[in-house]
UniProtKB/Swiss-Prot annotation:
Its main location: cytoplasm. This is SsrA-binding protein. Required for rescue of stalled ribosomes mediated by trans-translation. Binds to transfer-messenger RNA (tmRNA), required for stable association of tmRNA with ribosomes. tmRNA and SmpB together mimic tRNA shape, replacing the anticodon stem-loop with SmpB. tmRNA is encoded by the ssrA gene; the 2 termini fold to resemble tRNA(Ala) and it encodes a 'tag peptide', a short internal open reading frame. During trans-translation Ala-aminoacylated tmRNA acts like a tRNA, entering the A-site of stalled ribosomes, displacing the stalled mRNA. The gene is smpB. PROSITE patterns: SSRP. It comes from Vibrio cholerae serotype O1 (strain ATCC 39315 / El Tor Inaba N16961).
Length: 161
């Protein structure tokens, strides 16, 4: 029998993370979507030149789009094309997923936000979170819990020595 090929690539499959989203919102559910990209965008993503911190997802005419995502063009890759780093990109979701998201936005008042951008084999995928906004006191509670966890870890670490 032959051995299975192992992934020998060094590094992570993650291109960009939106850490701010988990601080600003309660994430109720997550979906994975493909993206419609141009050639220069794929080359830039291979170099990790993307930012999804200020991006949001909306549904228009039964299709999902992401706005506010920035992909910085490479100088050598996009010489013959006029590159728009902040263009609106179409997301590839199934009809059932689109209907589910559309219903949750309209009925429950939820928001769609981008959580992470990553490689799945040779395809770029984006993780979308169905989110509800946090109030200021919720953010404070999260910070208190995080600080309490750090203190517990410090005490346990010193007790084990």
């Amino acid at each position: 029998m032959t051995k299975k090929k192992t992934n020998t690539k060094a590094g992570s499959n993650t291109i960009a993370l939106n850490k701010k989203a988990r601080h600003e919102y309660f994430i109720e559910d997550e979906f994975e979507a493909g993206m419609e990209l141009q050639g220069w965008e794929v080359k830039s993503l291979r170099q990790g030149k993307a930012n999804i911190a200020e991006s949001y997802v909306y549904i228009k005419d039964g299709e999902a789009f992401i706005s506010g995502m920035t992909i910085i063009p490479l100088q050598q890759a996009s010489t013959h094309v006029v590159a728009n780093p902040t263009r609106i990109r179409k997301l590839l979701l199934s009809r059932r997923e689109l209907d589910n998201l559309f219903g949750r936005i309209n009925r429950e008042g939820m928001t769609l936000t981008a959580l992470s951008l990553y490689w799945s084999r040779s395809w770029v995928k984006i993780k979308i979170g169905v989110a509800k906004g946090k109030k200021l006191h919720d953010k404070r509670e999260d910070l208190k819990e995080k600080e309490w966890q750090r203190q517990k870890d410090r005490v346990m670490k010193s007790a084990l020595r």
